[in-house]
Amino acid sequence: MSPLTRTVAIKKTVKVLSKCQSGREYTQKFLQRAYSTSHANSTYYSRTKLFISSHSKALNIALLSGSLLLTYSYYSPKKILSLDTINGIKDYSTNTSGNINMPSPNPKGTETQKSQRSQNDQSVLILNDSKIEAKLHDREESHFVNRGTGIFRYDVAQLPSNHPIEDDHVEQIITIPIESEDGKSIEKDLYFFGIFDGHGGPFTSEKLSKDLVRYVAYQLGQVYDQNKTVFHSDPNQLIDSAISKGFLKLDNDLVIESFRKLFQDPNNTNIANTLPAISGSCALLSLYNSTNSILKVAVTGDSRALICGLDNEGNWTVKSLSTDQTGDNLDEVRRIRKEHPGEPNVIRNGRILGSLQPSRAFGDYRYKIKEVDGKPLSDLPEVAKLYFRREPRDFKTPPYVTAEPVITSAKIGENTKFMVMGSDGLFELLTNEEIASLVIRWMDKNMNLAPVKAEPGKLPKVIDVSEDKEAQRPAFRYKDNNSSSPSGSNPEYLIEDKNVATHLIRNALSAGGRKEYVSALVSIPSPMSRRYRDDLTVTVAFFGDSGTPSIVSNATSIVMNPEATTKPKPRL
């Protein structure tokens, strides 16, 4: 370890420490990139007067080595966390074994080091604990369902990275009249859960949260009018077709119809109505039919849905009911190349036309149309093209992107315990097994669950039985498989939340139970935060007809769970 007198902090750190010494109040922690270098004859310390009392109670500096942390510096109760803690992992990714590749020291100060220094020479105030908790809980909600129709609770949580958040979600129950065996009419439920991961703005995802269930329900109603027993049968093409039609009809209205109206009258209202066509969004919609206990998952894009339960031997298993639809999915690559023969650049660097990562999405007009009714979009008046975006390179034979979903079905039995839906930001941070294990641990503490078989401080073993695991992008952010710390001092999870979706988000940010990671990643403001994490949206639904507390008295009620819900604050 270098002597303290040979450690030089960069100028921004000096300025912040100077402010701290001035007596002004600041938040508890400060995130800053710092560098250590040989500086034997420097007059730096005496000139700044910062480190004269470096061994006093006012200021202590410590260098800690580890696979993830490069440096910690402590200034009285104020904390300085090196930005290398996060940047080293982000910038240097992981190797094939999953280990972290950290940059090697460069004492000569090469151009590469100088470039990295200039790019990362920025500071972020770390929020205090109460503000971090407020952010984590700001967008959480939980509901008890006492309808006796197969789902007894669902939790939702979000953590923005973009400002405003580009994700959205929907939870809705639609009742359908069913004729029972004795000829009586009874009501059964269709549960809809949706997550919409937007990009290029919040407009498309917001539109989907309001309209997608309505469009799908209308198409299902058309099928039901022709066949009253359609919801009794096992998975069938009629329901799948209705869901697909709802998706495609909404996307057609978003893109084609909005631009058609813009050609007819380029007024401000019609210009604004094209915003959901200009931005884009993935869509993940789950439909649980309480009549036959069939769960259908429709995915457009790269959000993911998991179901978890016990197999016949009592082992926990997790299964993905969706496959990530990106330019890295070989099935999607083959489909798109077949639709656009003779276009070698249709998939470039794992992206559609070298730009868009999801291969299916709502909106994203610039990957779908050049003209409407034979009229080129370039013919619109300039004022109508205010929000237009540049046409991609090699844009020859649109559409290159579709909103048509891929639909899968699963029978929900008594051993299927819960479903987790998440935007891709969650799966960048956690594996399918980790997500299922974290929910099981949460259930062990918060529900009447049989004791979980796992070592103290460890997550229970879960087997991933997904059919197409190779097509799913693995979790890659902040993964460190070299940790040798005992579970007691370095636990693999945190369990602090009453809302299980918030519990998943907290642990996704913790890099294996490290609270300092949660603090850092929650504190980084937008837009800088997008370098380190995406918007996070999570929904967890619990299957079964038990587990609802006595707070629910009405036999058909849906009741807010107050201890796991943060009521929205009035916005001026």
From Swiss-Prot:
Output the GO biological process annotations, alphabetical, semicolon-separated: signal transduction
The cofactor note reads: Binds 2 magnesium or manganese ions per subunit.
GO annotation, cellular component aspect: mitochondrial intermembrane space; mitochondrion; peroxisome
Q: State the EC number(s).
A: 3.1.3.43
**Compositionally skewed regions (Low complexity) per UniProt:** 481-491
Where do the segments described as Disordered lie?
95-122, 470-492
Name the positions where Mn(2+) 2 binds: 197, 424, 480
Summarize the PTM comment: Processed by mitochondrial inner membrane protease (IMP) complex and released to the intermembrane space.
Keyword Mitochondrion listed? The answer is yes
User: What Gene Ontology molecular-function terms does this entry list?
Assistant: [pyruvate dehydrogenase (acetyl-transferring)]-phosphatase activity; metal ion binding; protein serine/threonine phosphatase activity
PPM-type phosphatase domain ranges (all copies): 153-543
Q: Which CDD domains match?
A: PP2Cc
Basic and acidic residues bias spans: 470-480
PROSITE patterns referenced in this protein's UniProt entry, alphabetically: PPM_1 (PS01032), PPM_2 (PS51746)
**What is the residue range of the signal peptide feature?**
none
Function of the molecule: Catalyzes the dephosphorylation and concomitant reactivation of the E1 alpha subunit (PDA1) of the pyruvate dehydrogenase complex.
Q: What else is known?
A: Present with 7550 molecules/cell in log phase SD medium.
Q: What is the protein's name according to its record?
A: [Pyruvate dehydrogenase [acetyl-transferring]]-phosphatase 1, mitochondrial
Question: What species is this protein from?
Answer: Saccharomyces cerevisiae (strain ATCC 204508 / S288c) (Baker's yeast)
Q: What is the lineage of its organism?
A: Eukaryota, Fungi, Dikarya, Ascomycota, Saccharomycotina
